[in-house]
Every structure is written in structure tokens, then in C-alpha cells.
A protein has these predicted regions:
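Secretory targeting signals
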Residues: 1-27, 50-115
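A cytosolic-side transmembrane-helix exit/cap motif
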Residues: 27-34, 100-106, 130-139
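Amphipathic alpha-helical segments used for helix-helix packing
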Residues: 36-38, 66-67
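Short helix-to-coil transition segments within interhelical loops
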Residues: 37-46
């Protein structure tokens, strides 16, 4: 595959891994009985969520590197690091949105639906190519949008962690 088709494969298929790795990070603590136990611990819940988030990012990077390495091994030609980082950022944006919605709504299903809806809006063309929320910009050679996606997804995670900490205080 050439650069354009490789970007299409990575951006339209592989980024879905982010949904499955990040959305369920808060699901174990969504029960009221479990929340009572968690909020009495000495370690803050937001620290546990941050650790889970970092671990899921590391696993995401390893999985995308492995998949991209197999693509190179099977004679696909593309800039490895640029495409891996772009794919990781898009997957992180999808997963971060789902994680944030899951935390804010206290429902894992809502997180999955938000991430799937965001992906479908991008796939159907409802999000324009020039938008800072466009997931598939690598195939068009626009990497600047990926920086906006990275900032947006990190901001959502930080706001969600602050929300978890404030919710504990209430």
C-alpha cells in the first residue's frame, strides 16, 4: 500500500482500539456500593484513573507500533513514526471522549456511544476536513490537526480527573 492507503487503513480502522482501551477505565467504579469503598481509601480515585489512563496509552502505542510494523513488513510504504503518532493521537481522541462522557454520565454505555458517534460523524463527512476535530487528516498530509486533537483529548482527561476529585469532596 502507498502512503494514502496506509493512512486510510490506520485512521479508519486501527484508531478504534482507543475506544476499547480507554472508555472502560472508569466502569468498575460506577456502582454506588463500590464508590463508597473507593472514596474512603487514602489514595485518590483520580490517581488510580490517571495510572490506568497512562497504562492504556502505553498499550495503545505498543499495539499501533506492532500493527504498523507488520504493515511495513508486508511492503507498505509510509513514514513510520509520523503515522504511528498520528494514529495514536486519533485513537486517544476517540478514547478520551468516551472516557470523559463515561465519567461525567457515570455510564460506560454512554461513553461507548459518544465515541462511536464521533467516529461516525467523521466517517460520514459531517466533520469537515479543515476542522480541528477531524480524525482522518493524515491521508491529506495535515498533521497540525493532530496537535489540536492531542491538546483536546488531554484537556478532556484533565477536566474529567478534576471532576472525579471534586465529586469525591461533595
Amino acid at each position: 500500500m502507498d502512503k494514502v492507503h496506509s493512512a486510510e487503513c490506520l485512521e479508519q480502522s486501527v484508531i478504534l482500539i482507543g475506544i476499547f482501551l480507554m472508555v472502560p477505565l472508569n466502569v468498575p467504579e460506577q456502582s454506588k456500593a463500590i464508590q463508597e469503598v473507593i472514596y474512603t481509601r487514602s489514595i485518590s480515585h483520580w490517581k488510580i484513573l490517571l495510572l490506568r489512563f497512562v497504562m492504556s496509552i502505553l498499550i495503545l502505542i505498543m499495539m499501533i507500533c506492532l500493527f504498523s510494523g507488520i504493515m511495513i513488513w508486508k511492503n507498505c510504504t509510509f513514514p513510520f513514526m509520523a503515522y504511528v503518532m498520528g494514529t495514536v493521537i486519533s485513537a486517544m481522541a476517540l478514547g478520551s471522549l468516551g472516557l470523559a462522557v463515561s465519567i461525567w454520565s457515570n455510564s460506560g454505555v454512554a461513553g461507548y456511544l459518544a465515541s462511536a458517534g464521533y467516529f461516525l460523524l467523521n466517517s460520514m463527512g459531517s466533520v469537515s476536513d479543515g476542522s480541528i476535530f477531524y480524525l482522518f487528516s493524515m491521508g491529506k498530509g495535515n498533521y497540525m490537526i493532530k496537535l489540536y486533537l492531542l491538546g483536546w483529548s488531554l484537556l478532556m482527561v484533565v477536566i474529567s480527573l478534576i471532576y472525579v476529585e471534586k465529586k469525591r469532596d461533595c
